[in-house]
C-alpha cells in the first residue's frame, strides 16, 4: 500500500530505538524511549493559503528530521508503523 500525504502533511519513518541506556543497561520494550527523529518518506504538495496559492514544502523525501516527542499520528503501512504529521510539527532538518 502506498500513501501520499495531502497538503502540508509529512510521512516519517522513526529512527531505530536505543536498545541500551547511556550506562550500558539493556532496556526492555516498555523502558525504551521512542526517538524524536526520523527520515521523511513522503510529503504532500504544500499548505493551501487563503488566497488560493500553495506554500511549497521545506522538507523533501530523504531528509533526516527532528520532531516533538508527541508529534504526529502513527499509521500502519504494510508491516511498518510510520508517523504522519504536519510540516509545522518538524523542528528542524539534520544536516
Curated annotation (Swiss-Prot):
Subcellular location: Cytoplasm
Pfam families cross-referenced by the UniProt entry: Cpn10
Gene3D superfamilies (UniProt xref): GroES chaperonin
PANTHER family named in the record: 10 KDA HEAT SHOCK PROTEIN, CO-CHAPERONIN GROES
SMART domains (alphabetical): Cpn10 (SM00883)
Job of this protein: Together with the chaperonin GroEL, plays an essential role in assisting protein folding. The GroEL-GroES system forms a nano-cage that allows encapsulation of the non-native substrate proteins and provides a physical environment optimized to promote and accelerate protein folding. GroES binds to the apical surface of the GroEL ring, thereby capping the opening of the GroEL channel.
Complex formation: Heptamer of 7 subunits arranged in a ring. Interacts with the chaperonin GroEL.
Organism: Francisella tularensis subsp. tularensis (strain SCHU S4 / Schu 4)
Top-level taxon in the UniProt lineage: Bacteria
Gene Ontology molecular function terms on file: ATP binding; metal ion binding; protein folding chaperone; protein-folding chaperone binding; unfolded protein binding
The protein's name: Co-chaperonin GroES
Record HAMAP family: CH10
Transmembrane segments: none
Keywords, comma-separated and alphabetical: Chaperone, Cytoplasm
Amino acid at each position: 500500500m502506498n500513501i501520499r500525504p495531502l497538503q502540508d502533511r509529512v510521512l516519517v519513518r522513526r529512527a531505530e530505538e536505543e536498545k541500551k541506556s547511556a550506562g550500558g543497561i539493556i532496556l526492555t520494550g516498555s523502558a525504551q524511549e521512542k526517538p524524536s527523529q526520523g527520515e521523511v518518506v513522503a510529503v504532500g504538495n504544500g499548505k493551501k493559503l487563503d488566497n488560493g496559492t500553495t506554500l511549497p514544502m521545506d522538507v523533501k523525501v530523504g531528509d533526516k528530521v527532528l520532531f516533538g516527542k508527541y508529534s504526529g499520528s502513527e499509521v500502519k503501512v504494510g508491516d511498518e508503523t510510520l508517523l504522519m504529521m504536519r510540516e509545522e510539527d518538524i523542528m528542524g532538518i539534520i544536516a
